[in-house]
Amino acid sequence: HVLTDAAEETAQLLDTLTMGTFSLSRMNTVTANDLKNQNVQAFLRVIRRGEGTSDQDGYRRHFGGELFTSYADHPRKVITKTFAGRKLSSSAAGAYQFLTSTWDETARIMGLKDFTPASQDLGAVGRIAARGALDDVKAGRFDLAIKKVAKEWASMPGSPYGQPVISLATARNVYTSAGGAITA
């Protein structure tokens, strides 16, 4: 995957502004081989559990629970639901609840051509890499990886967004039950 010069300049500026905590250019380093890592697979299960998409239909789930039918592209549909008396609107979709804008950025950088389960998995690993957590996931530095992706997925422990999150204990349990190893 090759970023255009303008995209690379933007990515470098973002890397600088975030002091390296968020680096779009890291997404370019992710390959399908990263999906073969057991810790990566287990970590993806944690995210899906947090996002409420761990069931069979998770890859086809819109925000709020409705299902979409085509994997040709992100469904690009904003859905409004009422939770705890508050109306919330979101374009989040798929196993990792990608917003339309996040998916477009991810797909463009990573060269993803559809919204199939394989592309969603690869895109999620790209977002993990962008947050500087992929090496931590692979090495079993679970708590550190969770901390780094909490700004990417609002359902992760420590997320600053004020939405419901899964507990760190639940996240660890899902991770180890899926074969993930915690080393630190």
Where would I find each of the regions flagged by the language model?
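Cell-wall polysaccharide-cleaving catalytic domain and substrate-binding groove, primarily
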Residues: H1-K113, L122-A184
